[in-house]
Amino acid sequence: MNDLQLSAELALFLTKLPGEPGIYRMLDEEGTVLYVGKAANLKKRVNSYFSKQNTGVKTRALVSQIKSIEISVTRSETEALLLESNLIKALRPKYNVLLRDDKSYPYIHLSNHPDFPRIELYRSKKKPPSGNFFGPYPGVAAVRETIVTIQKIFKIRNCRDSYFKARSRPCLQYQIKRCTAPCVHYISPENYKLSVEDAIRFLQGKCQIILDELAERMKQAVSQLNFEEAAVLRDQIKNLRLIQEQQGVVQLRGDADVIAIEVRPGFACIQCVTIREGQVLNSQSFFPTVPYAVLDEELDANSLWQQTFEAFVGFYYLDTSERIPDLIITNQSITESRSLEYILSQRRGKSCKIQVNPRGVKSRWMDFAVNNLRISVAEYVSKHSTIKSRYQALKQLLALDKNIERMECFDISHTQGESTVASCVVFDTEGPRPSEYRRFNIEGITPGDDYAAMEQAVTRRFKRLIDAQLLPDVLIIDGGKGQVSIVKRVITSLGVEDITLLGVSKGPSRKAGWEKLILVNENREFVLPEDSKALHLLQHIRDEAHRFAITAHRKKRQKTRVESTLESIEGVGTKRRQALLQRFGGLRELAKAPLEEICKVQGINEQLAKRIYEHFHP
């Protein structure tokens, strides 16, 4: 043990730790989890934090705050790594390397519809639906681009099941040759299944297998004089070969992930290049939150690299064994490479190797990954230097003593008082934090009363923030002096004092650059020059709050109008309304539906069906 002053209780605990695999949680005096780790031998690993040799910056800072330690013994290292990954995601401890929440990374989902599966973008914290998932992808745009490619080549439907069931004729997707209209049985379940299987192989990077099968099918179609089907297959082959050329096929088979990591003061970047069947299928960047900002010792930089790699393994591979490749190539040696190989191989059900300093074609893959890593790091630094300079400009403008760590902005949206919604967006030193955005459905006020709407939203929000001890440094209101005064009264009544309250009024012309700023703390109003960095930051936050509010308002308004339209028809209550919408997918399709189709809806007799039909066809 070192000369740290350990409590008698903690010292005794360290002597009684088991020499088995498991995870450990280090807590401060308030019971907050500071760090979660895994170990093949809990006794050796946990005691190592308190040895004289462990002098790293991070370790010293961590150990100085430890009040107690909790452990969970597991049956294997694999189980320990899985449990560690899940706990880090759930608890987000201060001293762990934290990758962004899963919600931030979108997936492609193929549903498990028995006959005609649907392809869609999926991103949610909720329990995922059954079916096949592919990803994660670097962003929504990448997912949408891939889905469009799959629709063009394999013609997989992307419509909701409720819409699919209600179709009586093909939709626009069929007309533009992105769907085979399974809704009206223009394709058999057997042939559609072949297309789905090809799409899955495509997403797995198995293009050559698809090409071989398509060529064989085309040959059979020609021999059977089915020239129309042969032409379709020919076009699929042509499009797939074009994609192969774009992806850069190399003379090497097998699957690999190439992972290049760079650790900088304050952040780390992970570049993951996905190679499937010898093709560069994808390249994406991850920017985990690192547990401390200053790396003043080589040991700390190396240990953080190791921790970053292990965190990525837990985040990226352990949720689904299908993503684990034959080979993982890295740009730095791994301390526990054999242990990780064993864990990944067990999870996968077959061998997975980790390789450092590759040669030949594999070295070209690593060069590709490192080049992309450098570009990603440069873009990140450029973006965040801009954000940092804007934050500094706002700090100087507001004459604040401390740095701005967190800002929140509120906006109200409605259409002549209908379906009023308030939005709250959150920015920190990294920029927008979409996972912390909140929307508020405003009820019980006079329609169009923006003051009452703002009062209700801020009151609800700040009661939660006070309980969570997560108050912003700067509170921005998209509105004039009246709304800002209301908010000032609300936060004062809640006992909140140490917050800078700022109003952003649109000005008489409502043009960008002419905003009037209302600084409540100093009781002054002013306009900033158009090239002001502080103004650009405020405009960004204000525009994001407005976008989020108006999107939520439109959804609520559409839902309200659908409900009110149907409920105005005598005999249509909540259950029948839901049955109609489930059958037809929306008002537009219901309005187009013939009388005999409406009669088929459960709970709708002929008389009521006629009344509904006449409502849309007066």
Curated annotation (Swiss-Prot):
Domain GIY-YIG as annotated: residue spans: 19-97
Keyword terms, alphabetized: Cytoplasm, DNA damage, DNA excision, DNA repair, Excision nuclease, SOS response
Subcellular location: Cytoplasm
Main localization category: cytoplasm
Gene Ontology process terms (BP): nucleotide-excision repair; SOS response
Keyword DNA damage applies: yes
Residues annotated as domain UVR: 208-243
InterPro entries cross-referenced by the UniProt entry: GIY-YIG_endonuc, GIY-YIG_endonuc_sf, GIY-YIG_UvrC_Cho, Hlx-hairpin-Hlx_DNA-bd_motif, RuvA_2-like, UVR_dom, UVR_dom_sf, UvrABC_protein_C
Matches recorded under PROSITE patterns: GIY_YIG, UVR, UVRC
Family, similarity comment: Belongs to the UvrC family.
Protein function: The UvrABC repair system catalyzes the recognition and processing of DNA lesions. UvrC both incises the 5' and 3' sides of the lesion. The N-terminal half is responsible for the 3' incision and the C-terminal half is responsible for the 5' incision.
Protein name per its UniProtKB record: UvrABC system protein C
Organism of origin: Legionella pneumophila (strain Corby)
Lineage: Bacteria, Pseudomonadati, Pseudomonadota, Gammaproteobacteria, Legionellales
